[in-house]
């Protein structure tokens, strides 16, 4: 925290929107994970770091999953492997537009 907050004194909001997604955004468009971050901040506000780690773990985990999409990517990879396996066995034929043989678009 700076000793003299010039942005606040002059009413400027130059980079504050970068630090917290829940902050007011320049074009009034909420970020992808705004709701999850807001829930986590509301849960953790005022109870301290140690208690917040325990009591707000669900909200924090939801927020981190929204940011990093690790579970989603893992699931997508599993689905893709299963699809490739079925194609190799001959049990599944992808549609022509998925393999690049569809009609060209205008």
From Swiss-Prot:
Q: List the disulfide bonds.
A: 33-66, 43-56
Superkingdom, natural source: Eukaryota
Q: What is the lineage of its organism?
A: Eukaryota, Metazoa, Chordata, Craniata, Vertebrata
Q: Where mainly found?
A: mitochondrion
Which gene name does the record give?
A: NDUFS5
Q: What InterPro entries has UniProt attached to this entry? A: NADH_UbQ_OxRdtase_FeS-su5 (IPR019342)
Q: Which organism is this protein's natural source?
A: Pongo abelii
Description of its domains: Contains two C-X9-C motifs that are predicted to form a helix-coil-helix structure, permitting the formation of intramolecular disulfide bonds.
Q: What is this protein called?
A: NADH dehydrogenase [ubiquinone] iron-sulfur protein 5
Q: How does it sit in the membrane?
A: Peripheral membrane protein
Q: Which PROSITE patterns match?
A: CHCH
Subunit structure as annotated in this protein's UniProt entry: Mammalian complex I is composed of 45 different subunits. This is a component of the iron-sulfur (IP) fragment of the enzyme.
Per UniProt, the keywords (alphabetical) are: Disulfide bond, Electron transport, Membrane, Mitochondrion, Mitochondrion inner membrane, Respiratory chain, Transport
Q: Describe its function.
A: Accessory subunit of the mitochondrial membrane respiratory chain NADH dehydrogenase (Complex I), that is believed not to be involved in catalysis. Complex I functions in the transfer of electrons from NADH to the respiratory chain. The immediate electron acceptor for the enzyme is believed to be ubiquinone.
Keyword Membrane among UniProt keywords: yes
Q: Which family does it belong to?
A: Belongs to the complex I NDUFS5 subunit family.
């Amino acid at each position: 925290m700076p000793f003299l907050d010039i942005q606040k004194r002059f009413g400027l909001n130059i980079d504050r929107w970068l630090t917290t997604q829940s902050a007011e955004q320049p074009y009034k468009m909420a970020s992808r994970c705004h709701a999850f971050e807001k829930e986590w901040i509301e849960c953790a506000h005022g109870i301290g770091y140690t208690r917040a780690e325990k009591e707000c773990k669900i909200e924090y985990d939801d927020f981190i999953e929204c940011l990093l999409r690790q579970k989603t990517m893992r699931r997508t990879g599993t689905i893709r492997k299963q699809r490739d396996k079925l194609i190799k066995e001959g049990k599944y034929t992808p549609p022509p537009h998925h393999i690049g043989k569809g009609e060209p678009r205008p």
